[in-house]
């Protein structure tokens, strides 16, 4: 009978709904995690009732995690100085991100969560610049920052900083891990930095864009893409400068151009600058080196002395070198400085605590920017 069929369907629907409600009620409440507290500590939590151990990796290690009767592991960090901190969980030795913290980053092939405790490294109520992803010469992708108030149709022309990433990075490294747009917005608004265009190109010859955006089949990120230190990127760099000058209202004199990079990007910076001594007035080398050794067997980096002397003769307005005291490239960096001394190349040297880290590179950028285009 139609009435009986309707009743059966209704009973089935009620049963399914009741089961769903029971399952929802039994599901654990998602704990709050990645919470910055008033005392500058960060609260972490993850639901893992069957785990034998939960530890914290990254910048927030070591933070002791303790399991509660509700199956939630909780921990609280030490009081943190203002900065940008990354972390992840190891649940029974399996690395995983924090499911309760939506803020994630990719560094090379690794995903982590992050918390920001430094106001200068996050968005503030100030005029904001624009961040664009553009395809430059030879199909190379670049991130371009233009400052607040930028209007390509106006008569105003801007100085340009070219900012290069390290090994395993791409055009997203400085904007995301380096927090460059936030730093620029806040420092420009504070009157500490001259409004400028900042060009952050992909420096991987074999991969012209970040993973997922590279033309062709999607490729997973790798820590050392091929052909990154064989001279090709350095040789192609004048074409990037020419492209930027033809697409943006730039000032094209040497005193209005700066070039800086971290690690491999600092290595690229020095070799680009020595090959083009009249192109850049300001040069920044962050945790970098001159001789690739185990990283490359290319002959293009042999005998840099004559080109360094030509760079010295061109008298850069600033050559700024920064490195951490425990950086694994400290010895190579000292060898680079010895080559500079031998060539008569003047530089400003900054030694900091810490090693080969984004914390240092963000700090170096903040030290370098106010020195530009004065």
Predicted stretch roles:
Residues 24-32:
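Cleaved targeting-peptide boundary
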Residues 30, 36-63, 67-374:
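Non-catalytic cap/lid and distal C-terminal segments of serine-dependent acyl enzymes
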Residues 1-7:
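N-terminal secretory signal peptides that target proteins for export/translocation
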Residues 22-24, 167:
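Hydrophobic alpha-helical membrane-insertion segments, chiefly the h-region
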Residues 11-22:
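Bacterial N-terminal signal peptides
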């Amino acid at each position: 009978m139609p009435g009986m069929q309707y009743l059966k369907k209704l009973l089935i629907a009620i049963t399914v709904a009741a089961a769903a409600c029971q399952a929802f009620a039994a599901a654990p409440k998602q704990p709050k995690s990645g919470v910055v507290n008033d005392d500058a500590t960060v609260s972490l939590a993850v639901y893992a009732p069957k785990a034998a151990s939960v530890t914290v990796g990254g910048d927030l290690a070591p933070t002791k995690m303790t399991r509660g009767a509700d199956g939630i592991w909780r921990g609280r960090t030490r009081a943190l100085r203002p900065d940008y901190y990354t972390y992840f969980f190891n649940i029974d030795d399996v690395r995983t991100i924090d499911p309760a913290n939506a803020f994630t980053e990719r560094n090379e092939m690794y995903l982590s969560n992050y918390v920001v405790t430094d106001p200068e490294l996050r968005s503030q109520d100030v005029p904001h610049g624009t961040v664009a992803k553009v395809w430059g010469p030879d199909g190379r992708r670049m991130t371009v920052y233009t400052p607040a108030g930028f209007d390509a149709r106006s008569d105003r022309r801007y100085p340009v900083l070219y900012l290069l990433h390290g090994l395993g990075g791409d055009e997203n490294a400085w904007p995301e891990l380096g927090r460059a747009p936030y730093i620029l917005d806040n420092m420009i608004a504070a009157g500490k930095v001259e409004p400028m265009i900042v060009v952050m190109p992909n420096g991987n010859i074999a991969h012209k864009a970040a993973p997922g955006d590279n033309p062709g089949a999607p490729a997973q990120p790798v820590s050392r893409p091929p052909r990154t230190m064989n001279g090709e990127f350095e040789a192609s760099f004048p074409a990037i400068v020419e492209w930027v000058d033809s697409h943006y209202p730039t000032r094209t004199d040497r005193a209005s151009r700066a070039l800086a990079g971290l690690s491999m990007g600092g290595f690229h910076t020095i070799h680009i600058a020595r090959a083009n001594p009249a192109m850049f007035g300001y040069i920044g080398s962050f945790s970098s080196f001159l001789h690739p050794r185990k990283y490359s067997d290319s002959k293009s980096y042999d005998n840099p002395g004559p080109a360094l002397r030509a760079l010295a003769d061109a008298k850069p307005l600033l050559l700024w070198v920064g490195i951490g005291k425990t950086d694994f490239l400290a010895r190579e960096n000292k060898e680079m400085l010895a080559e500079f001394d031998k060539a008569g190349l003047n530089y400003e040297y900054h030694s900091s605590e810490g090693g080969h880290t984004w914390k240092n590179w963000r700090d170096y950028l903040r030290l370098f920017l106010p020195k530009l285009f004065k």
